Amino acid sequence: MENEREKQVYLAKLSEQTERYDEMVEAMKKVAQLDVELTVEERNLVSVGYKNVIGARRASWRILSSIEQKEESKGNDENVKRLKNYRKRVEDELAKVCNDILSVIDKHLIPSSNAVESTVFFYKMKGDYYRYLAEFSSGAERKEAADQSLEAYKAAVAAAENGLAPTHPVRLGLALNFSVFYYEILNSPESACQLAKQAFDDAIAELDSLNEESYKDSTLIMQLLRDNLTLWTSDLNEEGDERTKGADEPQDEN
C-alpha cells in the first residue's frame, strides 16, 4: 500500500509541476481510495489539483455568461442560442468535476479523517464544491446544492470551533469561503459581514499566539476577510452591485 501511495503522490507532484491537473486529480483519487488519513501535503495536492481543474471551467462560465448578457442586450438571438449551447457544455463539465470530488470526499476522505484539521478541511471542501454547483444551477437544483453546501460548512464550523485556534489557517479559510457563500449564493450580505467580522476579530484577539509556521498563511487570509468586509460594507451602505473580491482563498492556500 505504501509503495502505491508514494508512487501516486509522486505522480501528482509531477503533474502539478507540468500543469497536467486532470492527471494530478486522478493520482490523488487513487491515494484517497486507499482509505488512509491524508497528510497535510497530500490534502493540499488534492485541493490544488481539483481547484485548477474546476477553476479554468468556472472562469470560462463567467466569461460566457457575460458575453451572453451583452448579446441578449443587442438582440442577437442567433448568437445567444450558440452561447447557451456552449455554456451548457461548460456547465456539464463543471457538474462532472464537482460530483467527482464530492463522491471522493463522502466515500473516502471524510470517513478516513480522524484529526480535527482533516475533518474541517474536507467538510469545507465539500461546502466549496456544492457552492460551485450552486453558482451555475437554477431552481430546485440550485436550492439542493445550496442546502448541501450550507450543511457541509456548518459541520466544518462545528469541528473547527472545537479543535482549531481562531488563527489557524484552515479555520480562517473556512470563514472566508463560508462568508462568500452567504454573500453570493444566499444573497445575505449581513450574514456574510457578521461571519467574516467575527472570524477576523477572533483571530486578531489571539494574534500573539500565532506560530511562525502558519503566520504568512493566516495573515493573508485575514487580509482577504478584511478586503471583503470593506467591499460588502460599502455595498450595504450604497446598495451597490459590485462583485466580491478575493472570493476564495488564493490558490497557494489550498
Curated annotation (Swiss-Prot):
Q: Which GO terms describe its cellular component?
A: cytosol; mitochondrion; nucleus; plasmodesma
Please give the PROSITE patterns that the UniProt record associates with this protein.
Answer: 1433_1, 1433_2
The reply on keyword Membrane is no
Q: Which organism is it from?
A: Arabidopsis thaliana
Q: How does it assemble?
A: Interacts with DREB1A and DREB1B in the nucleus. Interacts with CINV1.
Q: Which GO molecular function, any one, fits this protein according to its record?
A: ATP binding
Q: Which family does it belong to?
A: Belongs to the 14-3-3 family.
Among Pfam families, the record links this protein to:
14-3-3
Q: Which domain of life is it from?
A: Eukaryota
Under which name does UniProt file this protein? 14-3-3-like protein GF14 epsilon
Which biological process terms from the Gene Ontology are attached to this UniProt entry? brassinosteroid mediated signaling pathway
Q: Which InterPro entries match?
A: 14-3-3 (IPR000308), 14-3-3_CS (IPR023409), 14-3-3_dom_sf (IPR036815), 14-3-3_domain (IPR023410)
- Keywords tagged on the record: Cytoplasm, Nucleus, Phosphoprotein
Q: Which gene encodes it?
A: GRF10
- Subcellular localization: Nucleus; Cytoplasm
